[in-house]
Amino acid sequence: MTPFALEYANQFRPEPAPALTSAEYTAVFNEVKSLGIANSTAATADQKLIGRFWNGAIQNYWNEITQTAVQAHHLTTAQSARAFALLNLTFADEVIAFYDAKYTYKFWRPVTAIRTAATDGNDQTAADPNWLPQSGNTAADPSYPGAHATISAGGAFVLSSVFGDKPLHLNVTSEVLPGVVRSFDSFADVEKEASLSRIYAGQHFRSDENAGESLGSAVADFVIDKFPTRFHGRDDDEGDREGRDH
């Protein structure tokens, strides 16, 4: 698939996931095995809630956040349209980029890794054939890099570029837990929690999330450079006229 802004799908493809016999893999394996299992005794109540809260279509959360920011900053209709377009164009290219990486590396999900750990050649990882992720069903695509992390890093990068980094109270509503709202003071705080949620949900290794965050930021940075904004100075004369005339 041809990207919208990127020159090619693998432009920012991350390095391969950690080797199965590495110390890094051992650490991330044991982390998700402990924190991400259904009915975990190691995860806190808040970590379990976070894992469930974000277990929906991550782009939808970030569009809600953008709506809050647009209203708080009193953008004109034209400026608001540009903000949403920039955000979702970034998401579109990030989806292309992370699927390119996922199907290049075809790295296993925690549920498969943990159940069949006896085959990984690492004597520091113990198999649990009955292990289930906290969030229930595992996504059908490969694990590395993490989609939530990629999208959230891109969303935070774009919105920080558009609105700046000043504190902004953000209420985010769960896509999957009706009526449950969590509050944040910055785009970066949202990004961090959304990324960590996939570990608590038992869906991803931390290495997936780290790679996703780097990929998402790189794609967003490229998009911003290609389609710069002028929102801070409110000097979009056409947008200001459009807002006043209507």
Model-predicted regions and their roles:
Residues 1-235:
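Acidic/polar surface patches and capping/hinge elements
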Residues 234-246:
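Glycine- and aromatic-enriched low-complexity segments, predominantly in secreted/extracellular proteins
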